[in-house]
Amino acid sequence: MSSLSILHLLLLLLALHAPQAKGLPVVTSRTPYSMLMKEIMDDLKKITPSPEGSLNSDEKNFLTKESLLQANLKVFMTFATDTFGSDSKIMKNLKEFQPVLPTATPTEDPIFIENKNLGDFRMKLEEYLVIIRNYLKSKNIWFS
């Protein structure tokens, strides 16, 4: 056996006999936000009509404000719960974004989604997901 092989074996044995850290476990998995967004988009395409028209500048402005990211998420989650149910994949995936968005107290009202208008919901949520992706990337929270 070569000395390099013996060294590797000794390192392995040392690692196995090393004392275990006490306290919280080290989290090695990361939430795959890109996959969550893809699942939301795939579900939206299956269950909602293609959006007609486009967002006006005021709507885009409401979606991009960092102080409204959490409030806007709540609007999308409420619509998703009311429309698809609290156990829907869209709702569950949206909920995953709550811990990573800023919780600033908004000074303005969040985005408005027309009542029971799936096209409006889809159009605004698609834009919102792009904004969230950019926000997470800017904070180095984005995980593929």
Swiss-Prot record:
GO biological process, one term: immune response
Compartments in which it is found: Secreted
Gene responsible for this protein: IL3
GO cellular component: extracellular space
Similarity annotation: Belongs to the IL-3 family.
Protein name: Interleukin-3
Keywords per UniProt: Cytokine, Growth factor, Secreted, Signal
Domain of life: Eukaryota
InterPro entries: 4_helix_cytokine-like_core, IL-3
Signal peptide range in chain numbering: 1-17
Organism: Bos taurus
Keyword Heme appears in the UniProt entry: no
Gene3D superfamilies: 1.20.1250.10
Role description: Granulocyte/macrophage colony-stimulating factors are cytokines that act in hematopoiesis by controlling the production, differentiation, and function of 2 related white cell populations of the blood, the granulocytes and the monocytes-macrophages.
Chief location category: secreted
